[in-house]
Amino acid sequence: MKKIMLVFGTRPEAIKMAPLIKAFQQKKNKFETIVCVTGQHREMLDQVLRLFNIRPDYDLNIMRQGQDLYDVTARVLTGMRDVLQEAKPDIVLVHGDTTTSTAAALAAFYGQIPVGHVEAGLRTHNIYSPWPEEMNRQITGRIATWHFAPTALSRNNLLQEGVDADNIHITGNTVIDTLYHVVSTIRENPTLRQQLNIQLRSAGYKTAYFAEQSRRKMVLITGHRRENFGDGFIQICQAIKTLAERYTEVDFVY
């Protein structure tokens, strides 16, 4: 039986790692699933853990008021040392481009434990945009043995960097699995459905979306906080406008 340790610390990571945790837990005869959270985001992380009923085996709880990247990196690195020595996993899975991911991958490397990188291969090829995420994911990619790329483009990025094709797997993005789970939860829970419809109305959306049997399709769009202003935001708005004009039967909600 293989020991699989999944390490994450922020809300986005938790959202995308939750389906993997559930999948591994359903194969208890093949895998021992170990969940380690760093608490890089504390309250926002805990929201997702409650949603998926995930109870971490280890919690580094590194969050401190006024912490910076130096603090996060150092606390994750030293915290993971003790966790890895105790748990002795066969593989460490990290996600994306956070400081938690990079520091955890580095800690696993120091312990000579192979790393799998979920959502691998995203690149802008500018280490300062986004910062520090672009460098984080490049470093993590250099450490990782297995690369789980969401798209063919991500795979090509890794191939261009010299990663062995046999170690790259196009998996899609696990956020879609999370989306299906949440939609199913909302449909089965009248209280949650009512709360969502209230929030939609308060945001100016006129339709009680989940209450309608016959309804228009809706596309919900979110953006990284750094793209919510300046040129990035303008480009997002232009793209939404193009899509809205092309697909008039769909409502695009940003």
Spans of model-derived segments:
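Conserved nucleotide-sugar phosphate-binding/catalytic loop shared by glycosyltransferases and other
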Residues: 29-75, 79
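A conserved nucleotide-sugar
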Residues: 30-32, 237, 241-254
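A nucleotide-sugar donor-handling region in carbohydrate enzymes
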Residues: 36-38, 42-43, 143-235
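An aromatic- and histidine-rich active-site surface loop
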Residues: 93-111
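A short, histidine- and acid-enriched strand-loop-helix "catalytic/donor-clamping" loop
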Residues: 117-131, 143-145
